[in-house]
Amino acid sequence: MKTNGLWRCLAAASLCATAILLIGFGCTVKDMLFPYRGQVAIAAEPKAVWTEAGSLEKTSEIRVVALGDSLTKGTGDNTGDGYVKQVAAGLRKTTNKPVKILNNLAINGLRTDQLAERLDRDKGFAYALQKANLILLTIGGNDLFHTARARNAGRKLSAYSMEGLSKELPATLERFGRIIKELYAINSSAKIVYVGLYNPFYDIKELRSGSLEVQQWNEKAYTLLHNYPNMIMVPTFDLFEGKIADYLSDDHFHPNHNGYKRVASRILDSLN
């Protein structure tokens, strides 16, 4: 009798232990399949970087770094303002915030391959860009227009002058893609404004066809920029076409003061 009672106790204990194990296992599976919000199993929701990246609204001051070619340097403007200083002045008025131009890193004649190399190797370049919350950029014109400019320098113009522009497009766009990728790696939170290209030779019959290639450039550049939440493109094509004499300087390539003023106004419209 005692032996039977002992076996009954052991059997009851085993059943209880098994039930406890099954309940625990069931709870574990439930937690794995249906975790509640307070548990570590729920990953943090991603930040809305697409809408907030590059926003200047919450900044106490605007810190500008400009880079690129002679257009950003302001070549052709006899006042020395270019578009960069005019953008800064306009932002002071529209935002009522202090606006500082930290650096203008533009270099006359700079090409996409040269800028890509600087961004990749020049730590001083990268350091300056990291301090900005607004980056202004022009690049690509020297790559595409060098053939036409050479032929325009005291030589007879011909339709062949624009053939080089079309041939340069693919390689220049590839380098442009590298540039904006590197810019994003250096500073993913700053608003980056790329100023689109225009055809400075629109009023010359033999070179007017270049407008078609310039439009291709602008469209493809926009497509590349669209991949980054903090980058925008400001078109300038329509600002000069048909108005070359009014808004280009004597070199027939760079804007004059009023031309840069129109570019600055377009940039301000895109930022406000």
PLM segments and residue spans:
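Serine-esterase "nucleophile elbow" of acetyl-processing enzymes
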Residues: 39-106
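N-terminal secretory targeting modules
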Residues: 1-65
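Active-site segments of SGNH/GDSL-like serine hydrolases
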Residues: 179-212
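Oxyanion-hole/transition-state-stabilizing segment in secreted/luminal serine hydrolases
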Residues: 118-167
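Structural recognition of the beta-strand scaffold that forms the well-ordered cores
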Residues: 63-66, 101-106, 133-138, 191-195, ...
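Substrate-gating cap/lid alpha-helix
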Residues: 200-235
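Surface-exposed cleft-lining segments at the edges of enzyme active sites
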Residues: 107-112, 154-172, 204-209
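Histidine-centered active-site loop/cap adjacent to the catalytic His
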Residues: 250-272
